[in-house]
């Protein structure tokens, strides 16, 4: 009986050892995302498929502000891209080829190409004073692309301080209005807080589209990234 009891103890200990084993796994893309974000790579996606009946053009815009006042940017800050291309806009021969190949997005509803998603991406350049911003409209394939540079400013109150960071915050998405500019993101500089003797970029986690956020009053330099559909 004693021998059987000892055997059971050894077997149980062996099973526990296996249960507590550390198993190596391959890292997934989700595991890499925090590293990309920390390095300055960010992508924001928006579903625009429901706008197909009310919009055929998108104006992609970057607005720059210094101390709350809009200023003229050095680089191109606006692009007009078609979000909807109809089969009927082609000549008769082209329409026939499209239908023969079955290459239309929705032949029944006269849609050849349709943008269903808007991607906004941020890519750091090998320069701490420039940030690249890209817009891409996609459907079953890329529909349109626009890229520009945002020139960052040195907003340190003391040049012995480290270089200031810029931060991203989203705007709240409210009811769609055709022809109205929709702010989607802010990319803004932190500011010096004399009370805590530190730089801050705090406030609303999502900004109101009516531009009343205190953060817009405090940040000395920021960009508003948005779109208008017509």
Which stretches of residues belong to each language-model region?
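Bacterial Sec-dependent N-terminal signal peptides
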Residues: 1-24
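Sec-dependent signal peptide cleavage junction
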Residues: 18-40
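Structured domain cores in non-transmembrane regions
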Residues: 52-161
């Amino acid at each position: 009986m004693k021998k059987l009891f000892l055997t059971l103890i050894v077997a149980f200990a062996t099973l526990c050892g296996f249960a507590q084993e550390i198993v190596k796994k391959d890292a997934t893309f989700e595991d890499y995302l925090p590293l990309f974000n920390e390095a300055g790579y960010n992508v924001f996606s928006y579903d625009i498929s429901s706008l197909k009946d009310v919009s055929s053009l998108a104006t992609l815009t970057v607005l720059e502000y210094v101390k709350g006042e809009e200023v003229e940017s050095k680089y191109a800050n606006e692009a007009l891209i078609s979000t909807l291309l109809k089969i009927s806009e082609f000549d008769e021969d082209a329409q026939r080829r499209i239908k023969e190949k079955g290459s239309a997005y929705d032949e029944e509803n006269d849609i050849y190409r349709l943008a269903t998603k808007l991607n906004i991406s941020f890519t750091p350049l090998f320069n701490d004073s420039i940030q690249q911003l890209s817009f891409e409209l996609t459907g079953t394939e890329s529909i349109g692309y626009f890229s520009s540079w945002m020139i960052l400013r040195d907003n340190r109150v003391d040049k012995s301080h480290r270089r200031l960071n810029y931060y991203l915050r989203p705007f709240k998405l409210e009811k769609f209005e055709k022809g109205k500019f929709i702010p989607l993101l802010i990319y803004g500089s932190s500011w010096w807080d004399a009370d805590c003797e530190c730089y801050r970029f705090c406030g609303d986690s999502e900004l109101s589209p009516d531009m009343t956020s205190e953060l817009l009053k405090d940040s000395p330099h920021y960009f508003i990234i948005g779109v208008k559909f017509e």
